[in-house]
Every structure is written in structure tokens, then in C-alpha cells.
Regions:
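Long, well-ordered, tryptophan-enriched scaffold segments
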Residues: 262-366
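Short beta-alpha connecting loops at secondary-structure transitions
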Residues: 271-277, 537-548
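Long, contiguous, secondary-structure-rich segments that constitute the structural scaffold
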Residues: 555-607, 699-701, 705-716, 720-807
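Phosphate/diphosphate-binding loops
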Residues: 496-497, 544-563
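N-terminal export/assembly segments and adjacent metallocofactor-ligating motifs
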Residues: 2-298, 324, 343, 465, ...
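Extended redox/cofactor-interaction regions of prokaryotic respiratory oxidoreductases
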Residues: 2-3, 174-259, 266, 284, ...
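Active-site phosphate/pyrophosphate-binding segments
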Residues: 322-441
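A glycine-rich phosphate-binding loop feature that marks nucleotide/adenosyl-phosphate handling sites
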Residues: 306-309, 363, 406-417, 575-590, ...
Length: 807
């Protein structure tokens, strides 16, 4: 390819081969003044200048990070995405750079499949048959049905479905329908979350809260032990945790041990040791480590005596049975008579006894040790017990409330105190678990406090009749047992109205009766708070990048219009006379009151972000309690760490539980259902666990082509299990159990334990739900259960048994 003029250069078709051949020309061009950049003579005088601008915004999906985005706009379209370019990017004041998901956000904004107009369902729920309607018809239909259901059934018949598609927003948050319902008498609310149901419940009984040291405190530790914790995929960006783990370990040179069924991306050469473990057996490992710590006199006895209840006989509550304390349980002197030795745990976990002993000695001798757990181990049928058992290792070694230690839960972060859009008080005090909403639709009047975890009263009076589904794929895709959920939603005499508000025709959107097109947070103004941000808090003032397209509207406008139709009092209570812009200015002003050094509103529109470091350098959970337990008691009945919980002992005695549902007053190991030793393994021999895939945040970004190509949806299977089934890497396989089946590509890899398989959660369901119901999209919930865990009544979505066959 010969090029002699600048015009020819501008018009030439360049391939990689031709570029390599002409590399000498390229070097000459850069060295010569004959070719100057830009080629300004190519601009035609008749062309009008194109208006360009750049605004600050944020990615607000539910990864736990809230990354700064610089959106470059031309012709009212985002064409280029930068991230944080502010400041000097030094440790402690680093740039909040987005991951590849956030950097691909223009592909979401400009996606051809975005919802454009209000629609109403004209086919069966799940068929995806809709017709376009006007905004007035949509809002009138919603308001009329809501008014009717409130009159006929009462406020407990209305529920706001769990959703996290815009979880990081403030006035664009998934929970904004709360405020509308609280403006007109309240609604049946929920407790817990799909992320942390089991661990949040368990830690409330143990510590009175679920809180951990910030990850930057790893700079002060000697050892990092991660149970099922994978921030390199779940919180990989500058607004997340991976940066802190890397930087802090460079300063402490701490040894890092990763315990996970998969060799995950957080390990990936960073770890000093990977211990693969059977899913759901982390509690057995923790108990065996405790056995070594106790028998080798490596526990912090003064800490246990001063700060804890129930470690041994002298701190056991007076009403507890003799030998009901933790030490007796571990040594085999309790009711079960089983010593929790490394040999005992090796048969359960698949980790050799000598490795367990080595790990225990490392934990016992490292002063301090940063022991943490992700949210994967607790997302099992025995998750409440597992999370307590792991946290006990921090308690036994006295690592709670100190620098370089941790409480044994997932890492925490410091909060600078962003003012949140107030949701108002809910007059309805009845609650259900976040995971039991399908039961509340199907047989709500039968749900009780002692069997189903109903709170606020002994039983539900009415089933759910009206469902708000905002930025939520939980309606079908993200909820356990898709086939069961499909059946429940088919009968529209049960839940009479489902209102969906979304950006795309997701699997869940197909089940809505009225479907409204939402503007994305990047198309609106909002005040965005950090979340998993270590010891550096920050707040982002997001500005709309583009004008509204088609008939998309902001959530605040939609709900204001519904409130207006419900009456002037409801409208006034919901809006307080403020527009969305006025609310943002109000929230900014309240945040600035707590942080006087924060720029004023107009200046922050230019700067985009305000960063502030924790005044104590590192955030330490329960520091005040450790320093003075009398003045700063925990929020437990005793004010101390409750190793033995009298409240849990009472619940275990009074709740209706099945034989394989165990609630224990101690952090004891319990197998759970659908686990490694379930008799069902004779039919379905492989354990299946989910994981948070870097290509998506749950199901958000699940329809972005470049991310799908970079990270294909596959089932992980060990070469030993694959060979036994004649499966090769890339083969299409059938994964199935009693709940459902899917066809998916096999990823044959030694990065997963034999006997265990894994599928990244959040892939969009692609199944003919009125035909064979075989999923071709890789949605793990076609295989999971809708049976809740014993205590939290949470989602046990990692406890699954399957078989895999080559197609």
C-alpha cells in the first residue's frame, strides 16, 4: 500500500498486515513535519460544528462499587466513556476508576433493545406479548388498581419486590416505590437481602451487627485468610476492594490463603495458598481449626473471658444446659459427643487433616490475622451456621476490634455520611423474608411467624395482590426455582397487578402487566454515595448526559404522577413540593453540612466527585467495644459477643422446622439440605454452586455483546468429572435436576474441585416456558430451589445437586 498524500492517507483502508508493512512510513510520519496532526484541511467549511460536551456520572448497579464516569456526548449520544481522571491517584486518595462493565455503559444507554414506550400485557405472563399505550392510560391503570387493592385487601397486600438494577442510586434507587407506598398507608415490607440474608441474620445474634474492618487495614496484618471471598470479580474496580487488598498487601507483605471451591480471580497468582473445599462445608473446617487452637492453647483466653458469652462453662448463661458451651462442643464433650478434629473435618471438606492443622497454626500464631468471608459461604442452606462458625475464628484469636484484625465477616468500609432520599416511616409493621414473596403470593394467608419467619404478627392476613417491580430481574431470573415461580405468576387471580419499571425487556419484564420505560441513572441528575470504598469515602454529583429519548421517564416523575392520581395529600407527602432537581440540591446541602469541605453544588457539577479519607486512617469494626465494653456494649442482650445465644436456643425450641433444618445456639457445623452428604447425591452426584461473574453485576450488563464475547457463559467442571462423562472443553452439555434443566457449554478446568461444578449467576433466561422449559441462556435459577434457609428464610442458591451429560 503506497500513500503519497494526506488525503489518500485519510481515505485509505488499513489492515493489520498493511499497517505492519508500512511501519517504516508510520515512523517517518511521526518524525517529519510534512504530516501535522490533526489534518485540519480535511474539515469542510460548509459543515456546521457538532456540539460536544462531557459530564460526570456514575455506574450504579449492585456490585458494591459506585465508580465515577466521564461521559463524552456528541449529537445527544454518548460516544466515549472515561472514568476518574481527577487528583493525583495516590494510595489513600486514589482515582475511582470503573471496570469494563462501567466503561461499556454507552452500549447499555444506546442499546437498540431498550424499552421506549409504556406498554400493557396482552398475552400470558411470560410470553412477552405487549401493546403500546399512552402514559395516561398506564398511570391511570396503575393508580386505579392500586386504589382498588388497597380498598379491598388493605396495605399488607402490596409489596415492593427486591431489585438492585439501580441499587447505587439515591433518588434513582430501586427502593423509591417505598416512599410512594409509605405516603399512602404503607405496604408489606421485607427483611434481609438476596446478597446477605443468612450472614446478616447470624451476625445480629453474635455481634449485634454485621460489620468488618476496611480492607486497607490489611496493611497492618500478618495473615489474610479469605473464606469464599472474591473481590477481584465482585468488586474489581477503583470503587471496590481489589485495589485496597493489592496495595495494603504490598505494605504488609501479609501471607494470603484463599479457601474456595474454585480457584477464583482473587487468587489468580496473588495467593500464597489455595485450599479447595466442598461447598457448604466451611463451617466444618472452622470447627476443626478451633479444635487445634483449643487443644494447642492458642486461643486468646483473656479476650474470651472479658468480651464473650458462652465460650466455656464460666461464661455460659445460667439457663443453658451443662456442657452446652462452645469449648465442650468442639472437644466432643457436648451433647453430640463428636470431637471436631481435623480428621473429622477432612472427610467432610476434602481438605487433608495435615493442611487443616497447618492452617490452624498459622491463624493462631499470626498476630494479628485478617480473617474474612465473602457472601458465598452464607448463601447456602446452612449459611447462618457457616457464617457464625467462620467468625468464631476471629473471636477465638482475639482479632476483633483491633487494627490488622477483623470480625471474621466481609470487609467493611468507612462512611462519610451522604444524605439519602428519605423513604418515610412505614405504618405497616408486618414483614416477610426477602426470599418468601412467592409463598406470600401463592398461600400468604397460611404463612406464620414460627414456620415462615413472618415478623410483626403471628400470621399474614392477606396474600400479595399488587407487586412493584422496579429495576428488578428478581421476578423470574434472579429468584430460586424458575419453574415454580413461573407457575405461581401464571395465575393472575393471585397477584392481580404486577407493575414493571425497567430499561430492557428482561426475563422478568415479560411477566409484568404494565411495563414502563425508565430513564437510566446516566440520563438523570443524582447524588451518588460510595459503598465498598475502604477508608476513602466519596460522593458523586451525577448530571444527565443526554436528553430523554422516545417516551422514557424518570422514576421520580412516574411515582409523582401516580401519587397525584391517588390524591393531593399523597402527592404532597411524596414530593414535599420538590422537583427531582430540588431534591438533589437538598440532599447535597445536607451532605455538605456533615462535610463542610465538600464543594458547593455548582462547583461540584464541574469537579464531579468529592473524596474524604477516614479520620482514623483505617476503619476498625467494633473498636469502641474493644476499648471499653462497658461504655460501648454491643447490640446483643448481654452487650457482649454471644458465642452461645439464648435467643437462638429459644427459636430452635419453638419454631416449626424440618428434620434437616437446624438452628443452633452455638456456631456449630450443620450439613444443611441439598449439600455434599444429602442422599439425593445418589441421583444427582455433582454439587453445583453459583458465583458472581465479572461479565455482569447479577443480570445487569447481561445483554452487552462485547462482555458476552469476553466472558462466555459456561459450566465449570473438573477434568476428572468431565472425563468420566466423555465431556471435552467447549462441548454442549445438559445440566439437570428435579427443578429444571439447561443446555450450556462446558468449561473443563482444574480450577474447580472434583465433584463440584459452578455456573456464574445472572445470565438471562432463554427458555420456552410454555414448551419444554429447557434454558439455553445459562440462568442458574432454573436449577436452584425456592426452599428458604432455616433462620433467615434466605436464598440457599449455592446448595444444589445436579447431573451433567454430554449432548
Amino acid at each position: 500500500m503506497k500513500i503519497h498524500t494526506t488525503e489518500a492517507l485519510m481515505k485509505a483502508e488499513i489492515s493489520r498486515r498493511s499497517l505492519m508493512k508500512t511501519s517504516a512510513l508510520g515512523s517517518l510520519a511521526l518524525a517529519s513535519s510534512a504530516f501535522t496532526l490533526p489534518f485540519s484541511q480535511m474539515v469542510r467549511a460548509a459543515e456546521a460544528p457538532v456540539e460536544e460536551k462531557a459530564v460526570w456520572s456514575s455506574c450504579t448497579v449492585n456490585c458494591g462499587s459506585r465508580c465515577l464516569l466521564r461521559l463524552h456526548v456528541k449529537d445527544d449520544t454518548v460516544y466515549w466513556v472515561e472514568s476518574d481522571t481527577t487528583g493525583d491517584d495516590v494510595y489513600g486518595n486514589h482515582q475511582v476508576r470503573a471496570c469494563l462493565r462501567g466503561r461499556s455503559i454507552r452500549r447499555r444507554m444506546n442499546h437498540p433493545d431498550r424499552l421506549k414506550y409504556p406498554m400493557k400485557r396482552v398475552g400470558k405472563r411470560g410470553e412477552g406479548k405487549f401493546e403500546r399505550i399512552s402514559w395516561d392510560e398506564a398511570l391511570d391503570t396503575i393508580s386505579d388498581n392500586l386504589r382498588r387493592i388497597l380498598k379491598d385487601y388493605g396495605n399488607e397486600a402490596v409489596h415492593v419486590l427486591y431489585g438492585t438494577g439501580v441499587d447505587g442510586g439515591n433518588i434513582t434507587n430501586s427502593n423509591v416505590p417505598y416512599r410512594l407506598m409509605n405516603s399512602c398507608g404503607g405496604f408489606l415490607s421485607r427483611y434481609g437481602s438476596y446478597s446477605t440474608a443468612q450472614i446478616s441474620a447470624a451476625m445480629s445474634y453474635m455481634f449485634g451487627a454485621n460489620d468488618g474492618n476496611s480492607p486497607d487495614d490489611i496493611a497492618n496484618t500478618k495473615l489474610v485468610v479469605m473464606f469464599g471471598n472474591n473481590p477481584a470479580e465482585t468488586r474489581m474496580s477503583g470503587g471496590g476492594v481489589t485495589y485496597y487488598v493489592e496495595q495494603a498487601r504490598e505494605r504488609s507483605n501479609a501471607r494470603m490463603i484463599v479457601i474456595d471451591p474454585r480457584y477464583n480471580d482473587t487468587a489468580a497468582g496473588r495467593e500464597d495458598e489455595w485450599l479447595p473445599i466442598r461447598p457448604g462445608t466451611d463451617g466444618a473446617l472452622a470447627c476443626a481449626i478451633a479444635w487445634v487452637l483449643i487443644t494447642e492453647n492458642m486461643v486468646d483466653q483473656p479476650f474470651l473471658d472479658k468480651y464473650c458469652v458462652g465460650y466455656d462453662e464460666k461464661t455460659l448463661p445460667a439457663n443453658a444446659p451443662r456442657n452446652a458451651h462452645y469449648k465442650a462442643y468442639i472437644l466432643g464433650e457436648g451433647p453430640d459427643g463428636i470431637a471436631k478434629t481435623p480428621e473429622w473435618a477432612a472427610k467432610i471438606t476434602s481438605i487433608p487433616a495435615e493442611k487443616i492443622i497447618q492452617l490452624a497454626r498459622e491463624i493462631g500464631s499470626a498476630k494479628p490475622a485478617y480473617i474474612c468471608q465473602g457472601w458465598g459461604p452464607q448463601r447456602h442452606s446452612n449459611g447462618e451456621q457457616t457464617s457464625r462458625a467462620i467468625a468464631m475464628l476471629s473471636v477465638l484469636t482475639g482479632n476483633v476490634g483491633i487494627n490488622g484484625g477483623n470480625s471474621g465477616v466481609r470487609e467493611g468500609s468507612w462512611d462519610l455520611g451522604v444524605e439519602w432520599f428519605p423513604m418515610l416511616e412505614n405504618p405497616v409493621k408486618t414483614q416477610i423474608s426477602v426470599f418468601t414473596w412467592t409463598d406470600a403470593i401463592d398461600h400468604g394467608k397460611e404463612m406464620t411467624a414460627t414456620r415462615d419467619g413472618v415478623r410483626g404478627k403471628e400470621k399474614l392476613d392477606v396474600p400479595i395482590k399488587f407487586l412493584w417491580c422496579y429495576a428488578s430481574n428478581t421476578l423470574i431470573n434472579q429468584h430460586g426455582d424458575i419453574n415454580h415461580t413461573h407457575e405461581v405468576l401464571q395465575d393472575d387471580s393471585k397477584c392481580e397487578m404486577i407493575v414493571g419499571i425497567d430499561h430492557f425487556m428482561t426475563a422478568s419484564a415479560k411477566y409484568c402487566d404494565i411495563l414502563l420505560p425508565d430513564q437510566m441513572p446516566t440520563e438523570q441528575e443524582d447524588l451518588i454515595s460510595h459503598e465498598s470504598a475502604g477508608n476513602m469515602g466519596y460522593v458523586i454529583l451525577a448530571q444527565p448526559a443526554t436528553s430523554a429519548k422516545f417516551e422514557r421517564k424518570p422514576i421520580y416523575w412516574m411515582l409523582s404522577e401516580v401519587a397525584k392520581r391517588l390524591g393531593p395529600d399523597v402527592y404532597q407527602t411524596f414530593t414535599e413540593g420538590r422537583s427531582q432537581h430540588e431534591w438533589i440540591k437538598y440532599l447535597h446541602a445536607k451532605t455538605k453540612e456533615r462535610n463542610p469541605e465538600m464543594p458547593d453544588y455548582e462547583e461540584m457539577k464541574t469537579t464531579g466527585i468529592f473524596k474524604k479519607k477516614c479520620p482514623e486512617e483505617h476503619y476498625v469494626a467494633f473498636r469502641a467495644f474493644r476499648e471499653d465494653p462497658q461504655a460501648n456494649p454491643l447490640k446483643t442482650p448481654s452487650g457482649k459477643i454471644e458465642i452461645y445465644s439464648e435467643r437462638l436456643a429459644k427459636i430452635a425450641d419453638t419454631w416449626e422446622l424440618k428434620k434437616d433444618e437446624i438452628i443452633h445456639p452455638l456456631p456449630a457445623y450443620t450439613p444443611g439440605f441439598d449439600g455434599w452428604d444429602d442422599p439425593l447425591r445418589k441421583t444427582y452426584p455433582l454439587q453445583l454452586t453459583g458465583f458472581h461473574y465479572k461479565a455482569r453485576t447479577h443480570s445487569s450488563y447481561g445483554n452487552i455483546d462485547v462482555l458476552q464475547q469476553a466472558c462466555p457463559q459456561e459450566v465449570w467442571i473438573n477434568p476428572i468429572d468431565a472425563q468420566a462423562r466423555g465431556i471435552r472443553h467447549g462441548d454442549t452439555v445438559r445440566v439437570f435436576n428435579n427443578n429444571g434443566e439447561m443446555l450450556i457449554a462446558a468449561k473443563v478446568t482444574p480450577r474447580i474441585l472434583p465433584g463440584v461444578t459452578a455456573i456464574g449467576q445472572g445470565a438471562w433466561l432463554k427458555a420456552d416456558m410454555f414448551g419444554d422449559r429447557v434454558d439455553h441462556g445459562g440462568s442458574i435459577n432454573i436449577l436452584t430451589s425456592h426452599r428458604p434457609s432455616p433462620l433467615a428464610k434466605g436464598n440457599p442458591s449455592h446448595s444444589n445437586l445436579v447431573q451433567i451429560e454430554k449432548v
